[in-house]
From Swiss-Prot:
Source organism superkingdom: Eukaryota
Protein name: Nuclear receptor subfamily 2 group F member 5
Domain NR LBD: 152-378
Chain's gene name: nr2f5
Zinc fingers, NR C4-type class: 54-74, 90-114
Cross-referenced CDD domains: NR_DBD_COUP_TF, NR_LBD_COUP-TF
InterPro entries in the record: NHR-like_dom_sf, Nucl_hrmn_rcpt_lig-bd, Nuclear_hormone_rcpt_NR2, Nuclear_hrmn_rcpt, Znf_hrmn_rcpt, Znf_NHR/GATA
Length: 403
């Protein structure tokens, strides 16, 4: 299978020292780190540092850091951005000049250039591991990392996991704490959280923000309802008929029995899709891959770079296949069963989800409008369409590395 290479060159061809090799992994030392070198400061031949300018800003380089020759300033900026999982926004057209005099003016474009010239996120994370903890195929740091202990996570999957805007265990507990019966307001708030988290997750994936804004909107417009169902299953969202009917606004005006029956049927279909995913006991890494496969679909209308979107989707599928093969060797059909669930997600149409969960919050405002506004704003949690109670903030942002 041909290797999928993204525009930041963090993935791979046939180089055995590369970080990610889809569906295969070379044995030996930690991928991406030359023998005898450390992840943060790559070993140089001899003791003399070559006279090379910083590949990011053009300042004097202090050596090779995280895969590329950079100055101390760009090295520190990149390390801080990756370790804290920071997300930036460009106020211009995402093509700001990055040089010695302008490098501090736009953090988004500076981080983008760091990645474009070849600095590697995974090298920062490997630098946090002790030599005794490092092992082939393990790219996640130990200690506070909530995904530690899963040795088959590829670098690609770890990027997807680190993009999650919430700690999975805490988020799941939050969904389950009122599992007996959730009120209308709780259901609407939880639905908003699921939508927010889907958008924030997409914005935090390194290769999604680099797409043109119209492509980002097109992808989310096409996939938001499927991402919503996946998030609902992932957090075991309680789905009781009575409050869902109330949330859909069916109590507000007289209705025919046929309309009630139709909505109850929609709720049943939604419940079935969630329960089938829960029955597979999909783990966090698998959910991240499935969401990436769903998000990066070339079926979205008006894409300017269909081939690039297809390559990311192929990479997501390959990463999932490799992970399942290694993590679940006794379940040879698991990968196929996971993929077969994806077409069924579209059975739950986006208008149905809007009516069931969002009509009380936004009225007739189209979800597509909300998605666009979320992408344009600095944070999806600053939602202008719903009053947020001060004592119960909607924000569930999680920074795994602390402030």
């Amino acid at each position: 299978m041909a290797m999928v290479v993204n525009q930041w060159q963090e993935n791979i061809s046939a180089d055995p020292g590369s970080q990610l090799q889809m569906c295969s992994q070379e044995p030996g030392g930690t991928p991406g780190t030359p023998s005898g070198s450390t992840p943060g400061n790559d070993a140089l031949s001899g003791d003399k540092i070559p006279n090379v300018d910083c590949m990011v800003c053009g300042d004097k380089s202090s050596g090779k850091h995280y895969g590329q020759f950079t100055c101390e300033g760009c090295k520190s900026f990149f390390k801080r951005s990756v370790r804290r999982n920071l997300s930036y926004t460009c106020r211009g057209n995402r093509d700001c000049p990055i040089d010695q005099h302008h490098r501090n003016q736009c953090q988004y474009c500076r981080l983008k250039k760091c990645l474009k010239v070849g600095m590697r996120r995974e090298a920062v994370q490997r630098g946090r591991m002790s030599n005794s903890q490092s092992s082939p195929g393990q790219y996640l740091s130990n200690g506070s990392d909530p995904y530690n202990g899963q040795p088959y996570l590829s670098g690609f999957i770890s990027l997807l996991l680190r993009a999650e805007p919430y700690p999975t265990s805490r988020y799941g507990a939050q969904c389950m704490q009122s599992n007996n019966l959730m009120g209308i307001e709780n259901i609407c708030e939880l639905a908003a959280r699921l939508l927010f988290s889907a958008v924030e997750w997409a914005k935090n994936i390194p290769f999604f923000p680099d797409l043109q804004l119209m492509d980002q909107v097109a992808l989310l417009r096409m996939s938001w309802s499927e991402l919503f169902v996946l998030n609902a299953a992932q957090c075991s969202m309680p789905l009781h008929v009575a409050p869902l009917l109330a949330a859909a606004g069916l109590h507000a005006s007289p209705m025919s029995a046929e309309r009630v029956v139709a909505f109850m049927d929609h709720i049943r279909v939604f419940q079935e899709q969630v329960e089938k995913l829960k029955a597979l006991q999909v783990d966090t890494a698998e959910y991240s891959c499935l969401k990436s496969i769903v998000l990066f679909t070339s079926d979205a209308m008006g894409l300017s770079d269909v081939a690039h979107v297809e390559s990311i989707q192929e990479k997501s599928q390959c990463a999932l296949e490799e992970y399942v093969r290694n993590q679940y060797p006794n379940q040879p059909n698991r990968f196929g069963r996971l993929l077969l669930r994806l077409p069924s997600l579209r059975i739950v149409s986006s208008p149905v989800i809007e009516q069931l969960f969002f009509v009380r919050l936004v009225g007739k405002t189209p979800i597509e409008t909300l998605l666009r506004d979320m992408l344009l704003s600095g944070s999806s949690y600053n939602w202008p369409y719903m009053p947020v109670q001060r004592d119960r903030p909607i924000s569930i942002h999680y920074n795994e590395n602390g402030p």
